A protein has these predicted regions:
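C-terminal catalytic/acceptor-binding lobe
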Residues: 74-75, 202-203, 213-289
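Conserved donor-nucleotide/metal-binding helix-loop-beta segment in metal-dependent transferases, i.e.
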Residues: 154-174
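A conserved acidic beta->alpha catalytic loop
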Residues: 96-106
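Glycine-rich, basic loop-to-helix element that forms the pyrophosphate-binding segment
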Residues: 122-138
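Short, well-formed alpha-helical segments that are part of the catalytic scaffolds
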Residues: 68-83
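Conserved donor nucleotide-binding strand/loop of the catalytic core
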Residues: 110-125
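Short aromatic/hydrophobic "clamp" motif used to bind/position activated sugar donors
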Residues: 143
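Short beta-strand-to-loop element that shapes/binds the nucleotide-sugar donor at the catalytic cleft/hinge
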Residues: 173-189
Length: 289
């Protein structure tokens, strides 16, 4: 099982995607699901457009790190290269959220001409606690979450296309941007392809039957901040090791996901998977610190 997991985790998505054992919803059922959410979400989204704490079309890039300086440096190098080639047409703020890495990482980050804010937690709070606090300090209408062991490997603009989807489809709360051959899991429920007015094609992921999976998740995602704030509080707890069934990854993704997924759906843009997790390093040392 472990070897299969390792192989799967290092496989990149194909074009067209490998849908494997995923289930496709018939168009009539999919329409019922997304129309209901559009009606429910539209007033929430329109209210957020005039919220003075949300700067319209601004993206807050939140980078979570924990004791992996080399991986973080690699990620930042790839982001710098990407933004040097693809100039964003939207306003950005870049926030580093560090979980107790110590002075070496923080001193390096301060010397980098890259971060607009650095949140340096003196101890490891755990991912759910750290991200919950960091999100409250963002001012963008959208949040792009990247974890320190990812890289960006893409040669086209995509941020503007994400905003286009958000502006035109009120059912979409989050866009998943990870390049991994993970679409074919048994619990994937996928809706028919849709398109924006500028021709950006995307599939919609529907919550799994248990309500926990397929939509809300961590790492390499861009989401509406209002989709987060309107879904209640991210549950927090002790920073248990991953062997504990209630570690913070479960709280963040599955427990909060049950609430988030009631109102919001996820988009996967066709041939737009900018972020890769090389999986060439040890598991984050932050679990159970």
């Amino acid at each position: 099982m472990k070897s299969n997991q390792a192989l799967w985790s290092k496989q990149l998505q194909t074009s067209p995607p490998d849908f494997g054992k995923a289930k496709f919803l018939p168009r009539w059922l999919f329409k019922l699901i997304y129309k209901k959410r559009q009606v429910r979400n539209k007033p929430i989204i329109l209210d957020s457009k005039i919220n003075p704490t949300f700067i319209k079309d601004k993206i807050s890039i939140v980078i979570l790190s924990c004791k992996r300086l080399k991986e973080l440096q690699r990620l930042i190098d790839t982001l710098k290269e990407y933004f040097s080639k693809i100039k964003p047409k939207v306003d950005l703020e870049i926030i580093l959220v560090d979980n107790g890495s110590g002075s070496d990482l923080i001193n390096w980050a301060k010397k980098e001409v890259f971060f607009d804010k650095i949140i340096a937690n003196k101890k490891n709070l755990g991912m759910a606690v750290a991200l919950k606090e960091a999100y409250e300090k963002t001012n963008g209408e959208y949040i792009l979450l990247i974890e320190d062991d990812f890289i960006i490997d893409y040669e086209k603009p995509f941020l503007e296309n994400c905003i286009e989807i958000f502006n035109e489809f009120y059912d979409i709360g989050i866009i998943r941007l990870k390049n991994q051959r993970n679409w074919g899991k048994r619990y994937r429920l996928i809706g028919p392809k849709r398109s924006t007015s500028n021709g950006t094609n995307f599939w919609t992921w529907i919550p799994s039957f248990n309500g926990k999976l397929n939509v809300w998740c961590a790492g390499s995602v861009m989401f509406r901040k209002v989709s987060l704030t309107s879904s209640g509080e991210i549950p927090i707890g002790p920073n248990f090791p991953r062997t504990n069934k209630m570690h913070q990854g479960v709280l963040y993704e599955e427990e909060f996901g049950k609430q988030y997924n009631k109102n919001w759906l996820a988009a996967k843009i066709e041939d737009c998977y900018p972020f890769i997790q090389p999986n060439d390093n040890a598991e984050s040392p932050g679990w159970g610190d």
